[in-house]
């Protein structure tokens, strides 16, 4: 595995829509592995591929309960209930802001084995999912 360079706000790749992953192969799995290593080394809770200069729909995240990898994630449902909390971002070091997010979401994604999985995160984990998915859409 390798540490990747986290690009900073203002880079054009962060403003572009990331491409869906056509096929989960060794290259995609290596990117996921490297992203996880990079996220943990930076003491982050989430990292999207555009943040490491890969315009692909890949996310790694960990709220303290284990690594979750998302490939081509799609939000299927969002609760009407929302909450406002402070968020930071590895691409904008040292900056924190209040953001309103859905309290609960339902997300469909692929695993590194190409299987479809449904997640229904709530609270802090739902916030991480939404923050990282924002990176996929510029």
What are these regions, as identified by a protein language model?
Residues 1-138:
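Positively charged
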């Amino acid at each position: 595995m390798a540490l990747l360079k986290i690009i900073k706000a203002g880079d054009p790749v962060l403003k572009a829509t990331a491409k869906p992953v056509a096929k989960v192969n060794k290259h995609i799995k290596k990117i996921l592995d490297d992203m996880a290593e990079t996220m943990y080394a930076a003491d982050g809770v989430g990292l999207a591929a555009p943040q490491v200069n890969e315009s692909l729909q890949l996310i790694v995240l960990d709220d303290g309960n284990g690594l979750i990898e998302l490939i081509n994630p799609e939000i299927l449902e969002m609760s009407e209930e929302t909450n406002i909390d402070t968020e930071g971002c590895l691409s904008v070091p040292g900056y924190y802001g209040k953001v309103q997010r859905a309290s609960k979401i339902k997300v469909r994604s692929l695993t590194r084995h190409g299987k479809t999985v449904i997640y229904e995160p709530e609270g802090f984990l739902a916030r991480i999912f939404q923050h990282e998915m924002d990176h996929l859409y510029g």
